Amino acid sequence: MAYYSRGGMGSLPPVVRTFLIVNVVVFVAQSLIPGLTEWGSLHYWTSSQFRPHQLITMMFMHGGFTHILFNMLVLWMFGSVLESFWGSKRFLNFYLICGIGASVVTLLSVPFTAAQFAKTASEASEGYGSLQIIEMYKQQYAALGASGALMGVMAAFAYLFPNTELMIFPLPIPVKAKYLIPFYFLIDLFGGLGIGLVGDNVAHFAHLGGAIIGLVIVIIWNRTNRKTFY
């Protein structure tokens, strides 16, 4: 059984290194440029703030230091392996497809999550009906983060390297990828279906969409022995 660990930062492949730099630069810019976060975050398509570019830009926006730190660690750990295994062009296309696909799934899921939220909120609100709450939810909805694309990366990693052992804080023992990453998927599935905390400000369906799209792509590539995707 292999024990998984990454080498030094100097060994980073070019696409992963570029994405790390871009995400950090954008994160700093978010605190310096008024309106940048709203411009780049994904709004629902009936909102006056929705723009098509947000399907891409949302994956380079983050909501806080912990958010970007975790995502960049995932990109470094798993993305570096996949880029080295596939090559830069193939990894770039894979990452962007997973990210854009996650954005589309997010938009498709908004009516469902809005109804979930309205069911809970209408019980505590005064003067607002469920339909009004749903419409306000849609107009105010905004999603951001690289997590959708990265769930696709993690799903591909688990498929290609299922027995690789991962050390995940705070667990004291290594866990194989084929167990750990499906566990994260189930957390998002339960969260997306409202089994647990509703309105937890996590785009669970973006994560699920990215993971499913990533898994489908890597299965197709593996079965057809495709060496390129560009």
Give, region by region, the residue ranges found by the protein language model.
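A detector for small-residue-rich transmembrane helices and their helix-helix packing motifs
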Residues: 1-230
